[in-house]
């Protein structure tokens, strides 16, 4: 049994759901049709019954702890999932350290950012999530991180370029939301969603990033890959070794086909599951 907080989750069911989730939204939103994989978009979930809600909360808590272990959420990043077939989302709370968050800490809010349940307080920046969910029906999960290397690009005029094969999914660009501070009003949430457009990630100037996916597993893996690519680019640009040459469109199409398949997403998700399990035992 895999446990998160007080709610047990069977490991086989958990991984089955993760694999199904990874199959969703595998094509980068603004990549051309020729560059996209053929896997379907959408959520693997069809019903929002109580059992599914508990499992979703457990997955949010686990993903948050894993992001904390990777050092990219800090003290106040958060993860959310849309409850399929409803106007509600589940999101991590404001008032719990990210490396100890449990199933019972996750709260429910509606798309107007009104908290509906939960013993904890919703994030001050719930509008990061609800703003994007209102604008993007294809998005089923959002990760808000505070990644060091990615945020560095939010204060320069240089864009994040695909310089790592895992960065190919961001070849259509990572825009910057040009507002400094918390995204804590409907107007700011809507503005962030407009800045994101149909892309996979957006930087919050001098602040963080919001990464979207058709499943929690996909949003999680994309968040990791955004920071990997940003680190690679900064290292290359500051090495003094010469001009940085990003991927060609042909490179992008090939790398997406090779490394953004459902099996590839699941492999990376499983790696972080195992890494988290080892860290938890240490």
Model segments located where?
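N-terminal secretory signal peptides
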Residues: 1-10, 33
């Amino acid at each position: 049994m895999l446990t998160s907080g007080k709610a047990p989750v069977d490991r086989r069911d958990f991984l089955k759901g993760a694999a199904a989730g990874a199959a969703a939204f595998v094509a980068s939103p603004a990549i051309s049709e020729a560059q996209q994989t053929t896997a379907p978009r959408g959520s693997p979930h069809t019903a929002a019954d109580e059992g599914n809600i508990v499992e979703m909360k457990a997955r949010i808590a686990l993903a948050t702890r894993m992001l904390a272990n990777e050092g990219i959420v800090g003290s106040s990043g958060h993860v959310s999932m849309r409850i399929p077939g409803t106007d509600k989302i589940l999101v991590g709370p404001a008032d719990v350290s990210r490396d100890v968050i449990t199933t019972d800490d996750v709260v429910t809010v509606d798309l107007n950012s009104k908290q509906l349940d939960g013993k904890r307080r919703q994030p001050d920046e719930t509008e990061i999530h609800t703003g994007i969910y209102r604008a993007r029906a294809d998005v089923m999960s959002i990760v808000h991180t505070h990644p060091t290397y990615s945020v560095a690009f939010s204060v320069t005029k240089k864009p994040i370029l695909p310089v790592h094969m895992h960065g190919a999914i961001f070849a259509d660009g990572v825009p910057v939301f040009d507002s400094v501070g918390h995204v804590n009003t409907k107007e700011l949430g809507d503005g962030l969603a407009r800045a994101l457009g149909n892309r996979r990630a957006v930087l919050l100037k001098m602040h963080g990033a919001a990464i979207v996916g058709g499943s929690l597993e996909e949003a999680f893996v994309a968040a990791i890959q955004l920071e990997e690519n940003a680190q690679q680019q900064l290292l290359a640009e500051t090495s003094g070794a010469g001009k940085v040459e990003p991927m060609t469109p042909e490179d992008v199409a090939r790398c997406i086909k090779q490394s953004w398949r459902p099996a590839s997403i699941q492999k990376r998700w499983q790696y972080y599951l195992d890494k988290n399990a080892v860290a938890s035992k240490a």
